[in-house]
């Protein structure tokens, strides 16, 4: 395949070749978005069916990393989209083994930025450039585009600019900030070269930490609204239960799907996360199919660690992370200790739930 190569940054019109390793929901949709813009994709996945499906849509399929590399013209670029951790570690090593000096690897998953620094040094010994790219957009990215936070050497990032430009949402995804005139910058188009290796995933890490806090705020607010009718329930006052002094203040049976809808329009708390909350509540107002067990994928923990290392207070983000731990029953034994202490010092028996 002989395609025009990028000779300058910030051009969305230059077509490129790109190998993509990992064809899950995000990897496959990113390939589709790039193909829509005319880029040529060579796809590989450990699942041959995923490769066949994308090949049927116009991608070049590969049954091995060696075949993928052979179908790409030098200098090659390979985008890895696999789960963070050991799988990424193994995949980076395997991809580097089939590349040559001057080629580039992009890790578009949610890797720890410290791992990026180490991996960049390792593959750099082979003359291979390493780019870390924090990717936000999820399953909606095919149509909406992906917000890209990029770290790595200038030469590699500039060469990959047409890929980033095609994946990003574009300037029309949001109103331009007052005072920004002239041609839109890459950041206004939805992608940013944040700095050297690790910077992209560092920014994405904090992005996800903020996401935890925003989600927790919506959840807590909705819980207050859900219980605004507590005054209708008789609460016995005894030594073990604080009385509700004014039950008349809590007589509201609020329609939470409707509250979410009204907040979406003109409210200062409007956001895409609120849009998704409204959609979930429209489908199931009581969310009965959910247990409330909330996972954390690592970025919230890494954000808290960075805040501690920097000496920066982050009570909201850290509490939101701890609430996720609590949702998984990890606070249950601590609660038993509290109950046991009350029994010891005051003879307080537990009340039935």
Label each residue range with its predicted role:
Residues 155-169:
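Phosphate/pyrophosphate-binding betaalpha-module
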Residues 3, 8-77, 102, 139-142, ...:
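NAD(P)+-binding Rossmann beta1-loop-alpha1 motif at the extreme N-terminus of oxidoreductases
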Residues 101-104, 108-157:
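Rossmann-fold NAD(P)-binding glycine/threonine-rich loop
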Residues 66, 78-94, 112-115:
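Beta-loop-alpha module in the N-terminal Rossmann-like domain of NAD(P)-dependent dehydrogenases
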Residues 81-82, 108, 166:
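Short, well-ordered coil/turn residues at beta-beta hairpins
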Residues 145, 149, 159, 171-317, ...:
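Helical "substrate-binding/catalytic lid" subdomain
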Residues 41, 61, 129-130, 314:
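Hydrophobic beta-strand scaffold residues
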């Amino acid at each position: 395949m002989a395609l025009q190569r990028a000779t300058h940054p910030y051009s969305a019109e230059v077509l490129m070749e790109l190998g993509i390793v990992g064809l899950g929901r995000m990897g496959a949709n990113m390939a589709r978005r790039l193909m829509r813009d005319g880029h040529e994709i060579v796809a590989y996945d450990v699942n041959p069916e995923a490769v066949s499906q994308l090949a049927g849509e116009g991608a070049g399929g590969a049954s091995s990393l060696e075949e993928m590399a052979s179908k790409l013209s030098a200098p090659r670029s390979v985008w890895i989209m696999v789960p963070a951790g050991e799988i990424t570690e193994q995949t980076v090593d395997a991809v580097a083994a089939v590349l040559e000096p001057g080629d580039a690897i992009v890790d578009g998953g949610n890797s720890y930025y410290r791992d990026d620094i180490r991996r960049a040094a390792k593959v750099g010994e082979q003359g291979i450039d390493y780019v870390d790219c924090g990717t936000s957009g999820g399953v909606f990215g095919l149509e909406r585009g992906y917000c890209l936070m990029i770290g790595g050497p200038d030469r590699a990032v500039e060469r990959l600019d047409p890929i980033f430009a095609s994946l990003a949402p574009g300037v029309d995804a949001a109103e331009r900030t007052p005072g920004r005139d002239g041609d839109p910058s890459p950041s206004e188009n939805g992608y940013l070269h944040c700095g050297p290796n690790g910077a992209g995933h560092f920014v994405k890490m904090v992005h996800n930490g903020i996401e935890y806090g925003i989600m927790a705020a919506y959840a807590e607010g909705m819980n207050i609204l859900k219980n605004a009718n507590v005054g209708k329930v008789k609460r016995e006052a005894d030594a073990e239960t604080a009385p509700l002094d004014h039950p008349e203040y809590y007589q509201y049976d609020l329609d939470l799907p409707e509250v979410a809808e009204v907040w979406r329009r003109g409210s200062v708390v409007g956001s895409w996360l609120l849009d998704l909350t409204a959609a979930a509540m429209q489908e199931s107002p009581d969310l009965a199919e959910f247990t409330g067990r909330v996972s954390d994928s690592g970025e919230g923990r890494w954000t808290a660690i960075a805040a501690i290392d920097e000496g920066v207070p982050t009570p909201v983000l850290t509490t939101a992370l701890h609430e996720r731990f609590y949702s998984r029953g990890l606070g249950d034994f601590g609660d038993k200790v509290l109950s046991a202490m009350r029994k010891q010092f005051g003879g307080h028996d537990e009340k039935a739930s």
